[in-house]
Amino acid sequence: MTLTKRILGSLLALTVVVLGALYWLGTRDDTSTGPAAAPSDPQQRIERGRYLALAGNCVACHTARGGPAYAGGTPIPTPFGTLYGPNITPDDKTGIGAWSADDFWQALHNGKSRDGTLLYPAFPYTEYTRVSRADADALFAYLRTVTPVSQANRPPELDFPYDQRILLAAWRALYFKPGALEPDAGQSEQWNRGRYLVEGVGHCAACHAPRNSLGATRPADGLTGGVIPGLEWYAPPLTNDPRAGLGRWSAQDIADLLQTGIAAHSSAS
């Protein structure tokens, strides 16, 4: 065997190993926080789920303008093409009516559909992975109570090669690690609740953090502001900076903005 053939063989073997490692990293599941939540009062669980759906603004991506609630169809433009929010009503055929709580948890926590298909990260499972199992079950319980709508989901309209879903394994290997958000014992209960809302169900980084050329955010950048891909709309920083961020804002200022869409220190949202 010539030296050239040996080198080529070694490179081929190395390529296979690297691709295999990327595929494994990109498709692995985290089951450490996966058991179903302990039974609780059904109505309280549904009400908790309704609160979470509002906090996460699920309706924004899962309700087309003028369409039925949570029936999907909302176009989500990205630099790679357009995706459409799916139907998450309890319709058995076109929604999530045939899903179990475990299936729903799989989507939020591991970024996979009911059949194991890798989900595109326009669905922010990079943040939703931090949602607790109890809250995932509550959100699922609430969605089971909304009016079922028979409306087929629109397939993604992505450019090549981004339409090759298998490539998501490499993206996930680089930018996604499923896992729970552990409370910081050195901080107050209120602080930890705020962190959970911001980094989990509220998925604030999805808009308020800069993205790289592959559409991924970096934890090191924090909530320093960023342009929302495809919309070319700038989401301002949510840091404590007194000039560019929220340093001069009171808790009431933030509450007013979230409730009314009107900011006391900047433009209307």
Indicate where each model-derived feature is located.
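The canonical Cys-X-X-Cys-His
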Residues: 49, 55-65, 104, 139, ...
